Amino acid sequence: MTLLRGLLWMSLLWPWLAPAAPGSWSAEAPSVRVAVPGRLYHSEALLPPGDAAARGNYIQKVRWRYSTPPGRSLRAWLCQGDRCLPLSGNRGISEALQGPAWSPLSFRFQLPDGERRAVTVTDIQVLVNY
């Protein structure tokens, strides 16, 4: 009887003791027009779907991508709350944003020094592994 009772308790507690299952989520944001030098422009929030937003899941890797017209460049950051990662190019992968998988991400863009022509950023995407 004691063994049976112990197994019953283990089966009830197991979901709480087991680590969160790995997974991924992806999101896209609408285009952003970056027009005024020195001003930061923010993408819309990139939100996880409900099932990926389970508490206890933490980001392992983030892949990002955005597009600009040929020959145009921007300063860009990928952010989770106030914590921002400077991006070295319009696509890449990083393990630096290892915060909660349920927290939204966003991009920030800025025209480089001396640039006066507006740039429209398209194809704004993330793929989050948790």
Residue ranges and their predicted role:
Residues 19-130:
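Disulfide-rich extracellular domains of secreted proteins
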